[in-house]
């Protein structure tokens, strides 16, 4: 007897709503930082950068840094070797998890000292894009429509969701941030943020940020929107680009 496997994919029945926003402040940011990850921890802004290049071809430096968000001053920074493209970051239990793009590995640092405590392989052959956490589990994007749910104790996949905006599959899900039970995700090359239900992958809302580009200093290497950080102290969302 031959057995056939049928793959069934469930699309979303939710029509995303358009959320409004208000700019409450603007802060300085290193324009040479090719931002891949952004997160607050104890009122300090942590940032992961990659060595990608903007429109002029000038390359950035892959790094992990923590900064004073009000002044842009960098308190501490560690750089990755040039063969590694730094990607998303998240902080769980005072540990910083940082992904690399195509090296199939990530790093765990002490959030205070930036001492690298572990190098870990991905649970399967995927690219590393964005990462966030819900206080218990990690959530990792890989440039497709998938977001993987990962056990931080084993760094193995326990589940995944496919991201859909109504009936349309949403690919290139990039930087992630967990805010009030939802995953806020940058979509690569789109000037918008998707608000994603972590249980089923449905995009429940969209934040259209196309107008932000005209409000930043227009530099030759200004690239795309990337970087979402929620500050629980101020209850505001910090947005940047690379």
Model regions and ranges:
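Beta-rich, blade/repeat-based domains predominating
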Residues: 31-42, 82-93, 123-135, 167-179, ...
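Beta-strand-enriched, solvent-exposed domains that form extended recognition/catalytic surfaces
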Residues: 1-14
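Short loop/turn segments that connect beta-strands within beta-propeller blades
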Residues: 67-72, 110-114, 151-155, 197-201
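Conserved beta-strand positions in repeat-built beta-propeller and related beta-rich domains
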Residues: 46-57, 98-103, 138-144, 185-189, ...
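Beta-strand-rich domains and repeat architectures in extracellular enzymes and scaffolds
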Residues: 24-65, 77-90, 130
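Blade-loop segments of beta-propeller domains
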Residues: 71-109, 115-125
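A short helix->beta-strand "capping" segment at the edge of beta-propeller domains
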Residues: 12-32, 69-75
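Hydrophobic, well-structured mid-protein blocks that either form specific transmembrane helices
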Residues: 106-164
């Amino acid at each position: 007897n031959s057995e056939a496997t049928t793959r069934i994919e469930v699309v979303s029945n939710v029509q995303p709503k358009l959320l409004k926003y208000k700019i409450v402040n603007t802060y300085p940011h290193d324009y040479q930082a090719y931002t891949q990850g952004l997160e607050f921890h104890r009122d300090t802004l942590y940032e992961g950068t990659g060595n990608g290049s903007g429109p002029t071809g000038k390359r950035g430096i892959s790094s992990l840094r923590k900064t004073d968000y009000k002044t842009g001053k960098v308190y501490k920074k560690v750089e990755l070797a040039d063969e590694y493209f730094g990607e998303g970051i998240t902080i769980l239990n005072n540990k910083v998890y940082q992904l690399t793009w195509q090296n199939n590995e990530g790093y765990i640092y002490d959030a205070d000292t930036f001492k690298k405590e572990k190098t870990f392989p991905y649970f399967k052959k995927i690219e590393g894009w964005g990462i966030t956490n819900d206080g218990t589990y990690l959530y990792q994007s890989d440039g497709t429509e998938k977001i993987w749910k990962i056990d931080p104790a084993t760094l193995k996949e326990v589940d995944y969701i496919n991201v859909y905006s109504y009936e349309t599959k949403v690919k290139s899900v990039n930087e992630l941030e967990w805010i009030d039970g939802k995953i806020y995700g940058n979509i690569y090359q789109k000037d918008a943020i998707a608000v994603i239900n972590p249980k089923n992958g449905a995009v429940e809302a969209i934040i259209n940020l196309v107008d932000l580009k005209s409000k930043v200093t227009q530099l030759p290497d200004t690239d795309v929107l990337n970087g979402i950080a929620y500050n629980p102290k101020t209850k505001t969302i910090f947005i940047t680009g690379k």
